[in-house]
Every structure is written in structure tokens, then in C-alpha cells.
């Protein structure tokens, strides 16, 4: 019987999660969904000083926004300390781990001497029990660390789904500290216990964990566990070619939401940031899950391209449901001081969205419908609301007022009739109308704008300009 696929995302809640971090959630999520398996969230919060619930909330919020639903968790490592201590005790009892009383000063001196001899700095196994070896009496009052009894010969081998076959000689690995003097377990130990207890079959994570992998595999083997499949993802680089990080200007995942990006655009972009399905650039979440595999993960670092993300976001805005976009855009309009009343917001979105890269862009254009009575620049009024144009404006207002139906086509036909009657070109009449109705010279198509403003508002505003 084939083992059920189980993947995990195991972030540290230290206050910031950027696109590179969340990609390490997206890929295991997609693989679990593709394989009809389980996606587990584990919060690695053993760094008590840097971890916070606020940071956990940011992680959960970002995952929820992107639709990365979890099947189990979140599990918190700090809530599993009893389990870790249980396994530590078992390892000591079975000879898989041992207490080491070497002080920090002694270890530093050892490493310095090794460096002077041109050797790789490493623990020398002084306190490691061996047949026939007589250990010194433990120093009084010194609390030991616990070290894992790493194999002395052989090698660690795994076929990484991204990097291929990797082999590390055990001679390169010293006896890893798995518990500190105060008894708290270390990162590599906790990860192994968690992955075994949670029956994780595929570990998909950043390649900064490659060096941890042989140590973790040896502990897994010692505990009699099954080694998972590893896939170590290359680094995500920022625009400057540096590793993406808060220090180098990366924005948080929820920051993209707050800037007006759609979650489907971010998911689509992240999916292609290190994985490919032929030449496909635009695909739905469902297609991504259907297509995702480990074989087509990229082997080279992926570089963040904000223009590509903006292009994708523009696409999803253009094809997006206008009612949904209206609700998502409303807060951005209100943040600009607009009051969403009068013009139908769904209709406004349909009119203005095509050239927008973000919902902020949509809101900026839509604002002309929701900022109250227009306050056009006096110089522009003087330039465009000339005495010569007044008769045409009056005629336009009269004919618009007489329309049986307030529809874009009828408004367009009325403009054409007035232009023909007075021998004018469209800009000569449209510019003053834009100023009077919208308070600005640049708007979408004038007939569509007037339709959305509504008959009463249009006639009132044109009338105010004619009377002035």
C-alpha cells in the first residue's frame, strides 16, 4: 500500500514573512493537494526571545490570503517539549546520545588548535563513550549538553528532488549537540522528532537547510524512522541579485495585499518563481495543483521581477469578476478620501480596471466618481470654459436632459448631434464637460463617465458651469 503523502511548512515566527519564505509553503501545499495528501503547518518557535504570537498571526494571515489551507496544525514546538524530553531520555538510555561536559572555553580552544593545524574545527569526541574507554569524572556543578552519537564511518546519501544525489561522509560530521545544558532541545533534533511523529513523507524547503540534512538523516536512522524525500529549493533573489530578505528591502506577503495585489496573481507569480510547466505563464490555482511536480523545480536561484508580478496582476484584474473587485477596491477608495455612493461601483470598476496594475491604481482612477463636487483648477476653467463654448454646453445640457433613457449610446449620440450643430471637434466640447462633471481633463470615455455619474449629477454640474 502506497504511503499517504504528507508535507509541511515549518516557519519560525520571528516577525516577517516575504515571498521567498511563503514559496516554501506554496510548493508543499501544491504537492500535497496534487497527491491527495496532507499539508501540515508547524511553528518552530523554540527561539523564545525572537518568537511572538504577532508573528504567528502574520504567517497565518498571509497563508489564508493566498488560500494555502492546512489539513493539520498549527503545531507549536514549544508545546511539544515533553515529547522531545521523552525521546532524549530514550536516546541516552539506548546509547544513541551521551552527556558532554566540555565547556565553551575548552571547545573554543580545541577549535583554535585545529585551525592552526589546518584541520576542520570540530568536536573531538572527548566525552563520547567507547568500549574500553575510561571517561573522566564529570566536573562538579557543570550541567552537560547532550550530543548525538554520530556514526564514525560510512556516509549519508540522499537523492534530492532538486539537487540530485548528495553524499556526505560521516567523517565530516561531528557529534551534534541535541540538548543544551538547561535541557532544551536544539533545532535539528526537534525537526527530526516532529517529522517522524507527523509522518512527513516529503520535506520541501529552502536550500539553506542542505547542511542540516545529513545530520537529520543520521538521527532519523538512529531512531528507526523512514527517511523522507528531500527537495531543497534554490534561493529567491531580489531585484539587485541579493538573497531576498527584510534587510534588503523585501516586502511582507500581506504587504502585497495592502498594495492592491490579488492573491491569485501572487500565487501564479510565486508558482513560476522556481518551477515551470512548459511555457505556461498564466494559469489558475486549479491548473497549478494539477500540473505541479517536483521534477520541474528549478535548480538555479530565481530572481524577483516586480514588473512581471505587476503584469500578472493587471491580467487578473482585467479578467476578474467586477463585483468582487468592487468590494476589494472599496477600502482603497475610502483610504483616498472617497465616499462610495452615487455611481455604481461595479460599473465604475468595469470601466477603469483594464489599465490598472494594482487595486490602488483602480481606486485612484475610480476616485473621480466618489470625491464629491468637483474642484477644478481655476486656470483650467478659464482655458476651457470660454464664452464661445457656452452655447454648445447649454444645448448639450438641454438635449441630455430630454433623453428618455440614460444610456451610454444615447449620450454618445447626443454629443455627436451637438458637435455637428456647432461645428466642433470632440475635445472642444468634451474637455469642459470633463472639468465640470469630474473636475479633471483626463477621464475614461466621456459617454461612459456621464452614464455612471447619473443624469441628475451630470445636469447639475454642467448647469453650474453654464450659469457661472
UniProtKB/Swiss-Prot annotation:
<dbReference type="InterPro" id="IPR000924">
    <property type="entry name" value="Glu/Gln-tRNA-synth"/>
</dbReference>
<dbReference type="GO" id="GO:0006424">
    <property type="term" value="P:glutamyl-tRNA aminoacylation"/>
</dbReference>
<comment type="subunit">
    <text>Monomer.</text>
</comment>
<feature type="binding site">
    <location>
        <position position="246"/>
    </location>
    <ligand>
        <name>ATP</name>
    </ligand>
</feature>
<feature type="short sequence motif" description="'HIGH' region">
    <location>
        <begin position="11"/>
        <end position="21"/>
    </location>
</feature>
<comment type="function">
    <text>Catalyzes the attachment of glutamate to tRNA(Glu) in a two-step reaction: glutamate is first activated by ATP to form Glu-AMP and then transferred to the acceptor end of tRNA(Glu).</text>
</comment>
<keyword id="KW-0547">Nucleotide-binding</keyword>
<dbReference type="InterPro" id="IPR001412">
    <property type="entry name" value="aa-tRNA-synth_I_CS"/>
</dbReference>
<keyword id="KW-0436">Ligase</keyword>
<dbReference type="GO" id="GO:0008270">
    <property type="term" value="F:zinc ion binding"/>
</dbReference>
<dbReference type="GO" id="GO:0005524">
    <property type="term" value="F:ATP binding"/>
</dbReference>
<dbReference type="InterPro" id="IPR049940">
    <property type="entry name" value="GluQ/Sye"/>
</dbReference>
<keyword id="KW-0648">Protein biosynthesis</keyword>
<dbReference type="GO" id="GO:0000049">
    <property type="term" value="F:tRNA binding"/>
</dbReference>
<comment type="similarity">
    <text>Belongs to the class-I aminoacyl-tRNA synthetase family. Glutamate--tRNA ligase type 1 subfamily.</text>
</comment>
<dbReference type="InterPro" id="IPR033910">
    <property type="entry name" value="GluRS_core"/>
</dbReference>
<dbReference type="GO" id="GO:0004818">
    <property type="term" value="F:glutamate-tRNA ligase activity"/>
</dbReference>
<feature type="short sequence motif" description="'KMSKS' region">
    <location>
        <begin position="243"/>
        <end position="247"/>
    </location>
</feature>
<dbReference type="InterPro" id="IPR004527">
    <property type="entry name" value="Glu-tRNA-ligase_bac/mito"/>
</dbReference>
<keyword id="KW-0067">ATP-binding</keyword>
<dbReference type="InterPro" id="IPR045462">
    <property type="entry name" value="aa-tRNA-synth_I_cd-bd"/>
</dbReference>
<keyword id="KW-0963">Cytoplasm</keyword>
<dbReference type="InterPro" id="IPR020751">
    <property type="entry name" value="aa-tRNA-synth_I_codon-bd_sub2"/>
</dbReference>
<protein>
    <recommendedName>
        <fullName>Glutamate--tRNA ligase</fullName>
        <ecNumber>6.1.1.17</ecNumber>
    </recommendedName>
</protein>
<dbReference type="InterPro" id="IPR014729">
    <property type="entry name" value="Rossmann-like_a/b/a_fold"/>
</dbReference>
<dbReference type="InterPro" id="IPR020058">
    <property type="entry name" value="Glu/Gln-tRNA-synth_Ib_cat-dom"/>
</dbReference>
<dbReference type="GO" id="GO:0005829">
    <property type="term" value="C:cytosol"/>
</dbReference>
<dbReference type="Pfam" id="PF00749">
    <property type="entry name" value="tRNA-synt_1c"/>
</dbReference>
<keyword id="KW-0030">Aminoacyl-tRNA synthetase</keyword>
<dbReference type="InterPro" id="IPR008925">
    <property type="entry name" value="aa_tRNA-synth_I_cd-bd_sf"/>
</dbReference>
<dbReference type="Pfam" id="PF19269">
    <property type="entry name" value="Anticodon_2"/>
</dbReference>
Amino acid at each position: 500500500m502506497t504511503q499517504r503523502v504528507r508535507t509541511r511548512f515549518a516557519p519560525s515566527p520571528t516577525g516577517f514573512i516575504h515571498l521567498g519564505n511563503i514559496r516554501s509553503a506554496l510548493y508543499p501545499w501544491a504537492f500535497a493537494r496534487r497527491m491527495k495528501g496532507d499539508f501540515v503547518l508547524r511553528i518552530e518557535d523554540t527561539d523564545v526571545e525572537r518568537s511572538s504570537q504577532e508573528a504567528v498571526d502574520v504567517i497565518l494571515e498571509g497563508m489564508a490570503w493566498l488560500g494555502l489551507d492546512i489539513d493539520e496544525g498549527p503545531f507549536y514546538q514549544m508545546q511539544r517539549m515533553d515529547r522531545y524530553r521523552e525521546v532524549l531520555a530514550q536516546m541516552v538510555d539506548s546509547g544513541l546520545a551521551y552527556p558532554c561536559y566540555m565547556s565553551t572555553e575548552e571547545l573554543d580552544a580545541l577549535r583554535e588548535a585545529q585551525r592552526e593545524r589546518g584541520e576542520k574545527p570540530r568536536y573531538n569526541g572527548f566525552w563520547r563513550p567507547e568500549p574500553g574507554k575510561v571517561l573522566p569524572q564529570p566536573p562538579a556543578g557543570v550541567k552537560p549538553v547532550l550530543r548525538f552519537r554520530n556514526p564514525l564511518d560510512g556516509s549519508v546519501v540522499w537523492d534530492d528532488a532538486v539537487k540530485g544525489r548528495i553524499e556526505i561522509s560521516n567523517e565530516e560530521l561531528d557529534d551534534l549537540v541535541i540538548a543544551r545544558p538547561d535541557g532544551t532541545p536544539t533545532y535539528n533534533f526537534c525537526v527530526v522528532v516532529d517529522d517522524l511523529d507527523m509522518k512527513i513523507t516529503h520535506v520541501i524547503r529552502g536550500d539553506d537547510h542542505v547542511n542540516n540534512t545529513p545530520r537529520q538523516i543520521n538521527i532519523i536512522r538512529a531512531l528507526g524512522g523512514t527517511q523522507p524525500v528531500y527537495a531543497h529549493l534554490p534561493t529567491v533573489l531580489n531585484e539587485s541579485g541579493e538573497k531576498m530578505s527584510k534587510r534588503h528591502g523585501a516586502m511582507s506577503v500581506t504587504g502585497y495585499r495592502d498594495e492592491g495585489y490579488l492573491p491569485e496573481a501572487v500565487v501564479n507569480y510565486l508558482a513560476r518563481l522556481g518551477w515551470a510547466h512548459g511555457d505556461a505563464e498564466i494559469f489558475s490555482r486549479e491548473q497549478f495543483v494539477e500540473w505541479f511536480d517536483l521534477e520541474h523545480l528549478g535548480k538555479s536561484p530565481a530572481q524577483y521581477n516586480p514588473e512581471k508580478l505587476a503584469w500578472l496582476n493587471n491580467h487578473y484584474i482585467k479578467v476578474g469578476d467586477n463585483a468582487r473587485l468592487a468590494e476589494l477596491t472599496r477600502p482603497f477608495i475610502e483610504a483616498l478620501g472617497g465616499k462610495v455612493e452615487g455611481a455604481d461601483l461595479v460599473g465604475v470598476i468595469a470601466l477603469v480596471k483594464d489599465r490598472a496594475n494594482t487595486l490602488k491604481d483602480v481606486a485612484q482612477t475610480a476616485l473621480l466618481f466618489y470625491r464629491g463636487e468637483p474642484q477644478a483648477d481655476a486656470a483650467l476653467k478659464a482655458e476651457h470654459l470660454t464664452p464661445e463654448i457656452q452655447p454648445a454646453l447649454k444645448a448639450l445640457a438641454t438635449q441630455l436632459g430630454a433623453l428618455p433613457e440614460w444610456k451610454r449610446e444615447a449620450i454618445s449620440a447626443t454629443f455627436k448631434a451637438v458637435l455637428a450643430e456647432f461645428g466642433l471637434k470632440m475635445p472642444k466640447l468634451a474637455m469642459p464637460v470633463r472639468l465640470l462633471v469630474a473636475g479633471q481633463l483626463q477621464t475614461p470615455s466621456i459617454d461612459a463617465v456621464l452614464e455612471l455619474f447619473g443624469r441628475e449629477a451630470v445636469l447639475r454640474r454642467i448647469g453650474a458651469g453654464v450659469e457661472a
